[in-house]
């Protein structure tokens, strides 16, 4: 059996309206790349990146969901096993911000109770086209007791910081396992397919 190259696996989810830049945020973090020609995500896709936090190698499995309503049934089935969820809106699109309340309700309905949440106001490099003041993002984050960052995938503002902060918040809540424990507990999301068991 191949030796595990990581200590912990965290499943993260990106949600928000179509066109807010979720895929760009993910690619900036996973590949340090920005592409202006992405087509809308169909259904769901994911990337993996391993980071080191507090001396532990943590594999981040980051799922990028489609924002369109027609994919709602597919994407909400992925909420259940998520340990961290990033809600993304576009600071140049007021409707995408208004819909954050809908996305928060989706989390309440479909995700685990103890899931870590974070709000991202994306495209902050386009300040001249801003329609959502930063204070509004801060206010909704305060009301829901979640962290908030304004980000730009294009010029790489706060992308890595947001992902690492979310991972650190999850790590803080993760029980420490015995170092000699070889078994992967699939009921706690310990393996790549482990989180699926929570859908049952």
UniProtKB/Swiss-Prot annotation:
Chemical reaction(s) catalysed: GTP + H2O = GDP + phosphate + H(+)
Protein name: Ras-related protein Rab-10
Gene transcribed to yield this protein: RAB10
Residue(s) of cross-link: Glycyl lysine isopeptide (Lys-Gly) (interchain with G-Cter in ubiquitin): 102, 136, 154
Compartments reported by the entry: Cytoplasmic vesicle membrane; Golgi apparatus membrane; Golgi apparatus, trans-Golgi network membrane; Endosome membrane
Binding-site list for GTP: 18-24, 35-36, 40-41, 67, 122-123, 125-126, 152-154
A GO biological-process term: cellular response to insulin stimulus
Subunit: Interacts with MYO5A; mediates the transport to the plasma membrane of SLC2A4/GLUT4 storage vesicles. Interacts with GDI1 and with GDI2; negatively regulates RAB10 association with membranes and activation. Interacts (GDP-bound form) with LLGL1; the interaction is direct and promotes RAB10 association with membranes and activation through competition with the Rab inhibitor GDI1. Interacts with EXOC4; probably associates with the exocyst.
PTM description: Phosphorylation of Thr-73 in the switch II region by LRRK2 prevents the association of RAB regulatory proteins, including CHM, CHML and RAB GDP dissociation inhibitors GDI1 and GDI2. Phosphorylation of Thr-73 by LRRK2 is stimulated by RAB29 and RAB32. Phosphorylation by LRRK2 is required for localization to stressed lysosomes.
The protein's required cofactors: Mg(2+)
Family, as annotated: Belongs to the small GTPase superfamily. Rab family.
Motif Switch 1 per UniProt: ranges: 32-46
EC number: 3.6.5.2
GO MF terms held by the record: G protein activity; GDP binding; GTP binding; myosin V binding
Residues recorded as bearing N6-acetyllysine in the entry: 102
Record-linked Pfam families: Ras
GO cellular component, one term: Golgi membrane
Annotated control of activity: Regulated by guanine nucleotide exchange factors (GEFs) DENND4C and RABIF which promote the exchange of bound GDP for free GTP. Regulated by GTPase activating proteins (GAPs) including TBC1D21 which increase the GTP hydrolysis activity. Inhibited by GDP dissociation inhibitors GDI1 and GDI2 which prevent Rab-GDP dissociation.
S-geranylgeranyl cysteine-type lipidated residues: 199-200
Binding, Mg(2+): 23, 41, 64
């Amino acid at each position: 059996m191949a030796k595990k190259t990581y200590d912990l696996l965290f499943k993260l989810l990106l949600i928000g309206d179509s066109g807010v830049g979720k895929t760009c945020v993910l690619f900036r973090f996973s590949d340090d790349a920005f592409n202006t020609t992405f087509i809308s995500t169909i259904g769901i896709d994911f990337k993996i990146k391993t980071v080191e936090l507090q001396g532990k190698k943590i594999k981040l499995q980051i799922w990028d969901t489609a924002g369109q309503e027609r994919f709602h049934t597919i994407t909400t089935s992925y909420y259940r096993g998520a340990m961290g969820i990033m809600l993304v809106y576009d600071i140049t699109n007021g409707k995408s911000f208004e819909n954050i309340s809908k996305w928060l309700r989706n989390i309440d309905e479909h995700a685990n109770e103890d899931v870590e949440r974070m709000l991202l106001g994306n495209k902050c490099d386009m300040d001249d086209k801003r329609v959502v003041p930063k204070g509004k993002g801060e206010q909704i984050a305060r009301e829901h007791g979640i962290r908030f960052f304004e980000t730009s995938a294009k010029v790489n503002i706060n992308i890595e910081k947001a992902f690492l902060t979310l991972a650190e918040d999850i790590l803080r809540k993760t029980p420490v396992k015995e170092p000699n424990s070889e078994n992967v507990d699939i009921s706690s999301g310990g393996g790549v397919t482990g989180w699926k068991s929570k859908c049952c």
